[in-house]
């Protein structure tokens, strides 16, 4: 999770999922926005073909939260998001998942620091590799105010870093596309 949380690098996490026992033929992929990262209000899309939906009924995800040193979202319960029933039928409207701001995690790997040399990724002019080690543990993020007013490389200024309970952070929508 460290590479994902700090730099948005999915390669290590993907390799770990592929090497896990009992998951032959699993489905994984990356969903990007127009510029790689998904900006506020933007949509990212991906297309995946289930190998055996009766055996692979659940959806798992993880994503870096930017800008940050090591904030991320992801489900901590592998059976939290069911998208197929026991017979492999798509569950339709159950394929919409709202991720709340209160579900943002801090990986505990780097101290939050929005300065140019602070190691936060996706801040204009900053080196995403230079963060100070925190030696913490994964916990719910309680504060991202360090990033209030910073600019991203795409020119977006972060104006709201409030982590209010009940606020939506992301929507994941899974739809079934009929076979042609």
Regions found by a protein language model. Give the residues of each.
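Glutamate identity and glutamate-enriched acidic tracts
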Residues: 2, 6, 16-18, 42, ...
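Intrinsically disordered, low-complexity, compositionally biased regions/tails
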Residues: 29, 33, 92, 99, ...
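An exposed acidic His-Trp-rich patch
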Residues: 70-127
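Long, compositionally biased interface segments
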Residues: 130-180
């Amino acid at each position: 999770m460290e590479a994902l949380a700090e730099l948005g690098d999915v390669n290590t996490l993907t390799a770990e999922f592929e090497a896990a026992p009992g998951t032959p033929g699993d489905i994984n992929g990356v969903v990007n926005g127009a510029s790689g990262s998904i900006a506020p209000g933007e949509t990212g899309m991906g297309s995946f073909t289930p190998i055996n939906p009766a055996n692979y009924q659940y959806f798992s995800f993880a994503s870096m939260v930017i800008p940050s040193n090591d904030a991320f979202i992801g489900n901590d319960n592998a059976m939290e998001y069911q998208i197929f029933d026991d017979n492999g039928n798509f569950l339709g409207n159950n394929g919409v998942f709202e991720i709340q701001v209160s579900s943002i995690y801090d990986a505990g790997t780097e101290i939050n620091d929005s300065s140019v040399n602070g190691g936060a990724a996706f801040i204009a002019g900053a080196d995403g590799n230079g963060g100070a080690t925190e030696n913490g543990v994964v916990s719910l993020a309680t504060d991202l105010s360090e990033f209030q007013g910073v600019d991203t490389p795409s020119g977006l200024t972060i104006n709201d870093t409030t982590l209010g309970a009940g606020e939506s952070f992301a929507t994941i929508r899974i739809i079934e596309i009929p076979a042609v």
